[in-house]
């Protein structure tokens, strides 16, 4: 984001007029303490605090300039912040859609215990009112998984299948994903990915399997093989393709596997424009391939 979003003139102007901006390294100085205090779970995380240091909202992950600016304006206006949603819910007790929005906000703020409290209320409401609509139950399962309760998510997905609710095939697939993660076992998901012709499902399956293999670190050749298959499912229309290909190349460099393929992918990434991080990856791969002079040329 440093190279595009933070250098956008509109965002610089907004920050100048509305914010006091501080950049903190979460690994140095007061960073580790602030990381714990504000429950930072990923990078980049942009916290928007009021004058007393209370969190109004946060923006997690990469955002292109236009989207990032919209988020800043939304937070400044107090729209769909936690306090805004809580006020709306207080005025409309029992509104399930508001409960869902509060749950999602607590998840975004990395407060899983509070999120689960509202999730339990929604699940109880659905059960007591025999409200078994696929999208409602499916959304509920996704949220339970996000807050760290995959076993509840799996139970809900199994319920969709048992009741033969519309789109139960989707529930079956996500059940496979969650069970693979929970059991740390890729066998069923590997079988599924070999049978399905659904590209989206293949992508999701590959990424879940790759995460498990990377965590276990017991079959790096299979991880590399599946990583290549996964990135090959994306075409040049995918807006984050350069970043995806660079990530693949860096991982292959770490593993010391599929280096020629990694070089091919990093060259494709550079077709979208030169980027210092991607150039560094290319130099590293060339070096490991023994093409030292070419690596030095890239660095220079």
Task: Identify the residue ranges that each predicted region occupies.
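Charged, amphipathic alpha-helical linkers/stalks
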Residues: 70-118
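Non-catalytic, surface beta->alpha helical segment in thiol-disulfide oxidoreductase systems
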Residues: 41-81
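Alpha-helical adaptor scaffolds
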Residues: 142, 174-179, 207-218, 228-288
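Register position in tetratricopeptide repeats
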Residues: 74, 78, 108, 146, ...
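Thiol-based oxidoreductase modules, predominantly thioredoxin-like and allied folds used
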Residues: 3-30, 48
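Generic helix N-cap/helix-start motif at coil->alpha-helix transitions
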Residues: 92-100, 128-139, 163-175, 198-209, ...
């Amino acid at each position: 984001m440093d190279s595009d979003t933070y250098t956008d003139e509109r965002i610089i102007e907004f920050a100048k007029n509305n914010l006091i901006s501080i950049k903190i390294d979460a690994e140095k100085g007061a960073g580790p303490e602030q990381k714990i205090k504000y429950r930072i779970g990923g990078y980049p995380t942009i916290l928007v605090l009021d004058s007393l240091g209370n969190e109004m909202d946060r923006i997690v992950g990469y955002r292109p300039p236009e989207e990032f600016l919209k988020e800043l304006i939304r937070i400044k206006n107090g729209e769909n912040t936690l306090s805004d949603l809580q006020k709306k819910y207080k005025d409309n007790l029992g509104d399930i859609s508001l409960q869902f929005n509060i749950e999602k906000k607590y998840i975004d703020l990395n407060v899983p215990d509070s999120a689960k409290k509202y999730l339990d209320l929604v699940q109880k409401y659905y059960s007591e009112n025999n409200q078994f609509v696929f999208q409602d139950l499916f959304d509920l399962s996704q949220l339970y998984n996000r807050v760290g309760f995959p076993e509840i998510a799996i139970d809900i997905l199994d319920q969709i299948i048992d009741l033969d609710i519309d789109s139960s095939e989707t529930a079956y697939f996500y059940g496979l994903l969650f069970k693979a993660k929970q059991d740390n076992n890729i066998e069923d998901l590997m079988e599924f990915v070999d049978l399905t012709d659904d590209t989206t499902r293949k992508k999701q399956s590959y990424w879940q399997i790759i995460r498990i293999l990377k965590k276990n670190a017991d079959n790096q050749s299979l991880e590399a093989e599946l990583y290549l298959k996964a990135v090959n499912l994306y075409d040049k229309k995918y807006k984050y393709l350069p970043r995806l290909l660079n990530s693949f190349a860096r991982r292959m460099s770490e593993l010391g596997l599929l280096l020629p393929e990694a070089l091919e992918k990093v060259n494709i990434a550079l077709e979208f424009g030169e980027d210092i991080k991607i150039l560094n990856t290319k130099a590293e791969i060339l070096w490991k391939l023994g093409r030292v002079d070419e690596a030095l040329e890239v660095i220079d």
